[in-house]
């Protein structure tokens, strides 16, 4: 977690209580400006690494949850192909209550063959995501790269099933894919 204690800062805004954090209304369609983007949030689709999860599958599932369309701004498939689903300053539907101050990026996978949370990111996904986050950091230099599970006040889950801070630090500094996999796993082979 980033911080479990209140008061806390979300971006540059002081939040006095969990109630204040959770009751913020996301009533606008667009964020105010690039300065509104405080977080670049990495997600996983929470699908098995041996299961194909197409854009159409993602759209169907998000609409079934009541979203008007896919809630993420970007979706990266196992082969490294990427699709864009929201304009950059359009409010997403991926990490409530942070949707009005974040960009959501999802990679296909996140579960092993048995359905357990696991870093299943392929080399192609890692490369594409690194390029995307580099470009997003240029557009939003104040934004912090975080995993969904790192945001206090969101639904407790393992998403994105890896240590996002370590992955981002390694990838944005140009480490090899194998080194990144080692960084994101504990010595016992489980997620950090």
How does the language model describe each region?
Residues 1-41, 45, 78-82, 87, ...:
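Basic/polar, cationic surfaces and motifs that engage anionic cell-wall
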Residues 46-57, 61, 86:
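N-terminal carbohydrate-binding/catalytic regions of secreted carbohydrate-active enzymes
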Residues 57-65, 132-139:
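Structured segments of extracytoplasmic/periplasmic soluble domains
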Residues 90-91:
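A short acidic/small-residue loop/turn micro-motif
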Residues 94-97:
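Short glycine-biased active-site loop of nucleotidyltransferases that positions the nucleotide triphosphate
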């Amino acid at each position: 977690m980033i911080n479990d204690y209140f008061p806390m800062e979300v971006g540059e805004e002081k939040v006095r209580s969990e109630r204040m954090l959770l009751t913020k209304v996301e009533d606008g369609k667009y964020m105010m400006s690039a300065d509104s983007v405080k977080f670049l949030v990495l997600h996983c689709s929470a699908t098995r690494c041996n299961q194909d999860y197409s854009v159409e599958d993602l759209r169907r599932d998000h609409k079934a949850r009541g979203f008007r369309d896919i809630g993420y701004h970007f979706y990266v498939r196992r082969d490294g192909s990427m699709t864009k689903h929201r304009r950059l300053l359009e409010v997403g539907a991926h990490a409530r209550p942070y949707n009005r101050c974040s960009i959501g990026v999802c990679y296909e996978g996140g579960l092993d063959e048995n359905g357990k949370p696991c870093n299943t990111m392929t080399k192609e996904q890692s490369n594409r995501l690194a390029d995307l986050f580099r470009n997003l950091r240029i557009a939003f230099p104040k934004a912090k790269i975080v995993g969904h599970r790192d945001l206090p006040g969101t639904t407790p889950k393992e998403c994105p099933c890896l240590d996002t801070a370590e992955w981002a630090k390694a990838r944005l500094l140009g480490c090899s894919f194998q080194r990144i996999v080692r960084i994101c796993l504990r010595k016992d082979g489980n997620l950090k």
